[in-house]
A protein has these predicted regions:
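Cysteine-rich micro-motifs
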Residues: 174-185
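Hydrophobic alpha-helical cores of multi-pass transmembrane domains in eukaryotic membrane proteins
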Residues: 38-42, 66-73
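Juxtamembrane "helix exit" motif at the C-terminal ends of alpha-helical transmembrane segments
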Residues: 39-56
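Hydrophobic alpha-helical transmembrane segments
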Residues: 55-68
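Conserved non-transmembrane functional hotspots
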Residues: 1-38, 73-172
């Protein structure tokens, strides 16, 4: 049935959007954490190893000062942008969209094997989960660029033609593709 294939296609692409966001946020969060630990550790280790009279200690303090400014800037950016909340939202979306995608694949395999009433119950459950997750994902401000990315990922994975350019993507990268459905991201 077409609606099951559609849910599978969309859920896969949506999980790719939020996985991509999650990886970007993960790197940023690691930088903030690294700088927060590195600065005091660098000064502490230098003083413990070489004492307060070490000739290079002023250079270490200067480097630590610059690193502290960077760390404070990243920390402030993280707080204002809500990186931790966004990371959690992305992780929840990836997990749930992947579960919906897997469920859709399972339901699709049962088409023709189950009687129509049981199949309808499975499809209704799948549709309800998909629509609820879709509403939650809409609050996460998905851009047109991300939608094109998701469409390309799904078209490539499912070996389907893009709905605009009617081409099956051969790679995950858009390259010179100028299609408004699967390129320009």
């Amino acid at each position: 049935r077409a609606e099951v294939a559609h849910i599978e296609f969309i859920s896969y692409g949506t999980s790719r959007i939020f996985d991509r966001r999650m990886r970007s946020l993960d790197w940023k969060r690691k930088v903030v954490t690294f700088l927060g630990v590195f600065v005091p550790l660098m000064i502490g280790c230098a003083v413990l190893s070489f004492g307060l009279e070490a000739p290079f200690l002023p250079l270490c303090i200067t480097i630590a000062g610059v690193a502290s400014i960077m760390q404070l800037g990243f920390s402030l950016w993280s707080l204002v942008s809500g990186w931790d909340r966004s990371y959690s939202d992305c992780m929840a979306s990836v997990k749930e969209n992947t579960a919906i995608y897997n469920l859709a694949g399972s339901v699709r395999k049962k088409i023709g094997k189950l009687d129509e009433a049981k199949l309808e119950i499975l499809i209704d459950d799948l549709t309800e989960k998909f629509e609820r997750r879709e509403q939650e994902d809409l609050t996460l401000c998905v851009s047109d660029k991300e939608l094109r990315y998701a469409n390309r990922m799904s078209c490539f994975y499912f070996k389907k033609k893009c709905h605009i350019c009617n081409v099956v993507p051969l790679t995950l990268k858009p390259g010179k593709c100028v299609c408004d459905g699967c390129g320009k991201f």
